């Protein structure tokens, strides 16, 4: 009996040791990420000018600073990009800011091949921080995602960013002052442990009658775009009701499905 107890406690010690090592490594990596970003003049300058203001805005909204967890969603026809924030995964998201998207390429509907000038539609996450972008600062998204790879042409394209300036051939530009804020928020969330910052891109606000009317009018002869948008709307509706993100999967045909 004593030997069995010894083995149990020995195993617990090993588990605890591994947990502590992994935690230390993750914390170190997060700290290193922030330190690395601060080495870039644009990031350091933006932090000096904007961090205090963002901190006060967070306090006024009842949010903890630095940002713990953020969610980004963008609406193509409505030319808006929202930033939602919450303090932890048990809370509902709160809308923090809405930025104007100052330029748009292409039409409604998903991106399907290199050079179509389309802004993607679907469910993504930030996979790159680019502090020395040609467009001031840029946040890359993981286009093409697994759905895009199934549904798209052999060359679906890539290099899709949320960035500064006000030009685009398929990205999401929100001008320099706004990308500085968003970059700081995303950087803070990543440094706080949010490895996957979701970015959802919708063709329209599905609760805006004018947007819905425009979508119906311009896609009336394209059932594939309509069917694709209907899948996106399910996720939109879920978030509008719950203020939390559903678990999203992709089936063998490339279609999005909600798992909860």
Segments (PLM) and residue ranges:
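A conserved hydrophobic position in a structured secondary element of the catalytic/binding core
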Residues: 174
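Hydrophobic transmembrane alpha-helices
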Residues: 202-203
């Amino acid at each position: 009996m004593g030997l069995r107890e010894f083995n149990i406690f020995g195993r617990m010690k090993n588990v605890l040791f591994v947990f502590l090592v992994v935690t230390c490594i993750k914390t170190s990596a997060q700290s290193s990420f922030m330190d690395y970003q601060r080495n870039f003049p644009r990031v350091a300058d933006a932090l000096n000018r904007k961090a205090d203001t963002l901190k006060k805005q967070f306090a006024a909204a009842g949010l903890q600073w630095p940002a713990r967890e953020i969610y980004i969603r963008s609406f193509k026809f409505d030319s808006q990009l929202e930033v939602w924030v919450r303090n932890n995964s048990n809370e509902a998201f709160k809308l923090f800011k809405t930025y104007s998207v100052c330029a748009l390429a292409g039409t409604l509907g998903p991106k399907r091949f290199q050079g179509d000038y389309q802004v993607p539609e679907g469910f993504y996450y930030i996979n790159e921080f680019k502090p020395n972008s040609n467009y001031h600062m840029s946040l890359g998204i993981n286009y093409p995602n697994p759905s895009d790879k199934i549904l798209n042409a052999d060359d679906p394209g890539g290099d899709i960013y949320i960035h500064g300036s006000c030009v685009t051939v398929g990205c999401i530009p929100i001008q320099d002052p706004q990308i500085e804020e968003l970059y700081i928020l995303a950087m803070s969330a990543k440094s706080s442990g949010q490895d996957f910052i979701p970015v959802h891109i919708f063709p329209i606000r599905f609760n805006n009658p004018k947007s819905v009317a425009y979508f119906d009018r311009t896609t009336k002869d394209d059932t594939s775009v309509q069917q694709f948008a209907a899948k996106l709307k399910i996720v939109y509706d879920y978030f509008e009701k719950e203020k939390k993100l559903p678990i999203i999967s992709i089936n063998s045909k490339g279609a999005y499905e909600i798992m909860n």
